[in-house]
From Swiss-Prot:
Name the record gives this protein: Phosphoribosylformylglycinamidine synthase subunit PurQ
Annotated source species: Synechococcus sp. (strain CC9902)
One Pfam family of this chain: GATase_5
Subunit (UniProt): Part of the FGAM synthase complex composed of 1 PurL, 1 PurQ and 2 PurS subunits.
One GO process term, biological-process aspect: 'de novo' IMP biosynthetic process
């Protein structure tokens, strides 16, 4: 079991993810520079948080053209597991692997706090360890985390059981309290909260550990 962590210019949570996968779960982890295209030997790929390419134009708008992401499209289409955290979620929507968009928070401020969450679906392997309606708390840290989509897209997400996580107390104005969604196949998960920051009691909780432990199965 080997995990790939994509590193863009401007990423700042890649080492946090690597610590969670290697330091907490003892999983071999390979850092993937944005210009790489070889994903062979990887069982899952994580797109970490940060400010890829400085978030110029729009969050994730430039990152979508990175060579590594062209390979990721093929990886995901073949059932490879992909996790996009915060900026990684934004990149996945820009790439078209997940629908909708992440826009400025409703209050127009950067939000950094612990967020209560509810598991809305365990259809994806990433969340099966929690159980339906489970509650957890994960840190959030974003200025553009407000999930938005058309009414038709929202209905599709609801009908296909693709809404994975909802906020217990909506911090940013996301439609339907959405904190994370999956693709219809369930192998791609994008979320704004940071599970890698909640894997070690020393850093404030372990609610994110079960999500990353899904990589062991």
């Amino acid at each position: 079991m080997t995990i790939g962590v994509v590193v863009f210019p401007g990423s700042n949570c890649d080492r946090d993810v690597q610590w969670a996968t290697e330091g907490c779960l003892n999983l071999p982890t390979r850092r993937l520079w944005h210009e790489e295209t070889d994903l062979s030997g990887l069982d899952a790929v994580v797109l970490p948080g940060g400010f890829s390419y400085g978030d110029y134009l729009r969050c994730g708008a430039i990152a979508r053209f990175a060579p590594v992401l062209q390979s990721l499209m093929d990886f995901a289409s073949k059932g490879g597991r992909v996790l996009g955290i915060c900026n990684g979620f934004q990149v996945l929507t820009e790439l078209g692997l997940l629908p909708g968009a992440l826009t400025r928070n409703q209050n127009l401020h950067f939000i950094c706090e612990d967020a209560p969450l509810h598991v809305s679906s365990t259809r994806t392997d990433w969340l099966k360890a929690y159980g339906n309606a489970a509650s957890l708390v994960l840190p959030i840290a974003h200025g553009e985390g407000r999930y938005q989509c058309s009414n038709d897209t929202l209905k599709q997400l609801q009908d296909q059981d693709c809404i994975a996580l909802r906020y217990g107390s909506n911090p940013n104005g996301s439609v339907d309290d959405i904190a994370g969604i999956t693709n219809p196949s369930g192998n791609v998960l994008g979320l704004m909260p940071h599970p890698e920051r909640a894997c070690d009691p020393a850093t404030g909780g372990t609610d994110g550990r079960s999500m990353l432990k899904a990589l062991l199965n």
